[in-house]
């Protein structure tokens, strides 16, 4: 009887302890639930730390600011091949935001966190990049929170109308198909399109992608190669773009690229105005507008646009070379030479490098 009572008391005590433990756990979890104001502050802190670390040439903060657990779960939902071939290498390569932004800075480009917003309870940060070759991108970062800190959980990539998780899933799957003897017909066609693009055979690539569009849109790289073909081969740019039925941000991004390339400054400004509704304002838009004006041979107007850009951002390489192009086309030799010499203190160029640049223009 005594043993029975002791056993009962022990069980009661255990249950009580479990109850206390659960209660403490609940209190701890409640304690770590962030308010909207705290989440907003965490996002602001994330942006400030990211900017400072990249300016200091340090990639670690942003490389570690990805919620790899959440991103991997999103990738695996899409039936990827992360555990096969180079799957995990592809995954980690796409997560290296710090390396990515540091490389852009080192190339003479720039980046900017343009705007933040909250939609359906999810925090977003729009990142703009502009590399040393004049390529610009917008990425809508989807932010989650862990231990009070903001982390990147996924991102919408304007240029390919896909989430980062879709891109990783598609790339890892296609990578496996490239290593086996009998890939699916769709994978073979996508591999062929990749090879045609690498060889500069845009016409053949464009024909293949249009013929197989319904089957190949499962691969995010389809949008990359399709838009290359669109810019190189299409006789109805707007119509072919709309036919994809893609996200409006993708459409506006590529319409702007097309307007810049063809020197349609009026259309460029129209698309910029529409994109600002999604990205927030950014002085890089003045650089892009200046490029459209330059291609339209409106050099004085382009110089004015570059000057406006400089008031809101660093004097990046493309602004400098853009101004040099305008002065050269205007045959303003004196101002051209003065601007050229500025390359010594702006970018640390030697006399020989300055002389080479002068000859190239």
Briefly describe each language-model feature range.
Residues 105-176, 354-361:
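Exposed beta-sheet edge and beta->alpha loop/turn motif
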Residues 22-56, 180-189:
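Short, low-complexity N-terminal intrinsically disordered segments enriched in polar/charged residues
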């Amino acid at each position: 009887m005594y043993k029975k009572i002791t056993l009962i008391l022990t069980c009661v005590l255990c249950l009580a302890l479990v109850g206390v433990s659960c209660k403490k756990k609940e209190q701890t979890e409640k304690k770590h639930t962030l308010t909207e104001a705290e989440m907003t502050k965490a996002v602001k802190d994330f942006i400030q730390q990211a900017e400072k670390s990249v300016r200091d040439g340090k990639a670690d903060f942003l490389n570690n600011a990805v919620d790899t657990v959440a991103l991997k779960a999103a990738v695996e939902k899409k039936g990827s091949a992360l555990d096969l071939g180079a799957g995990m290498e592809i995954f980690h390569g796409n997560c290296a935001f710090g390396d990515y932004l540091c490389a852009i800075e080192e190339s003479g480009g720039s980046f900017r966190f343009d705007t933040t917003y909250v939609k359906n309870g999810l925090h977003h940060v729009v990142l703009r990049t502009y590399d040393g070759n004049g390529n610009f991108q917008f990425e809508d970062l989807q932010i989650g929170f862990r231990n009070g800190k903001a982390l990147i959980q996924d991102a919408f990539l304007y240029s390919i109308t896909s989430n980062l998780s879709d891109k990783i899933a598609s790339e890892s799957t296609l990578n496996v198909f490239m290593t086996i003897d009998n890939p699916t017909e769709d994978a073979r066609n996508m591999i062929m399109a990749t090879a045609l693009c690498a060889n500069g055979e845009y016409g053949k690539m464009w024909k293949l992608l249009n013929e197989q569009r319904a089957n190949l849109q499962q691969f995010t790289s389809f949008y990359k190669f399709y838009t290359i073909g669109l810019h190189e081969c299409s006789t109805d740019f707007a119509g072919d773009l709309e036919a994809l039925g893609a996200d409006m941000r993708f459409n506006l991004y590529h319409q702007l690229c097309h307007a810049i390339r063809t020197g349609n400054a009026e259309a460029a400004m129209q698309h910029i105005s529409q994109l600002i509704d999604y990205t927030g304002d950014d002085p890089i838009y003045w650089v892009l507008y200046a490029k459209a004006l330059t291609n339209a041979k409106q050099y004085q107007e382009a110089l004015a646009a570059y000057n406006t850009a400089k008031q809101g951002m660093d004097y990046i390489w493309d602004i400098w070379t853009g101004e040099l192009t305008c002065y050269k086309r205007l045959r303003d030799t004196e101002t051209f030479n003065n601007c050229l010499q500025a390359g010594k203190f702006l970018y640390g160029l030697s006399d020989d490098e300055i002389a080479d640049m002068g000859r190239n223009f």
